[in-house]
Amino acid sequence: MTGGKSGGKASGSKSSQSRSSKAGLAFPVGRVHRLLRKGNYAQRVGAGAPVYLAAVLEYLAAEILELAGNAARDNKKTRIIPRHLQLAIRNDEELNKLLGHVTIAQGGVMPYIHQNLLPKKTPKTGKNPSQEL
């Protein structure tokens, strides 16, 4: 054998592949499986459950980061800060419903001015009615 330990697998066998790479995910399937087992959510955890949960978590993270990146770009910034996360989540109807009771540290508040506090719009007719003869 070349450069390996003696014994073990044959030199022609392929290397091990993680469950995350098999599923095409960036989130760790093995870690999610371990956390599901240690969390006492159920006595047994199926093989597909951590893959599905990791895929859902990866999708949610990608969705939030995309919207936060757009908010950062709108503010002419290159780095996402908690304020951008807050703006992204609160401006999206579904994410706001999902994370409605979540407080984001250093997120600030949503800008809102009540209609009664805005200046009144005056109709522009071109001529003042009192000056007409």
From Swiss-Prot:
InterPro entries: Histone-fold, Histone_H2A, Histone_H2A/H2B/H3, Histone_H2A_C, Histone_H2A_CS. One of its GO terms (molecular function) is DNA binding. It is found in: Nucleus; Chromosome. Residues 1-10 have a biased composition (Gly residues). The record marks K120 as: Not ubiquitinated. The modification N6-acetyllysine is found at K5, K9. Its main location: nucleus. Keywords: Acetylation, Chromosome, DNA damage, DNA repair, DNA-binding, Methylation, Nucleosome core, Nucleus, Phosphoprotein. Gene3D superfamilies: Histone, subunit A. GO terms for biological process: DNA repair. Core component of nucleosome which plays a central role in DNA double strand break (DSB) repair. Nucleosomes wrap and compact DNA into chromatin, limiting DNA accessibility to the cellular machineries which require DNA as a template. Histones thereby play a central role in transcription regulation, DNA repair, DNA replication and chromosomal stability. DNA accessibility is regulated via a complex set of post-translational modifications of histones, also called histone code, and nucleosome remodeling. The nucleosome is a histone octamer containing two molecules each of H2A, H2B, H3 and H4 assembled in one H3-H4 heterotetramer and two H2A-H2B heterodimers. The octamer wraps approximately 147 bp of DNA. In contrast to vertebrates and insects, its C-terminus is not monoubiquitinated. Belongs to the histone H2A family. This is Histone H2A. It comes from Coccidioides immitis (strain RS) (Valley fever fungus). The gene is HTA1.
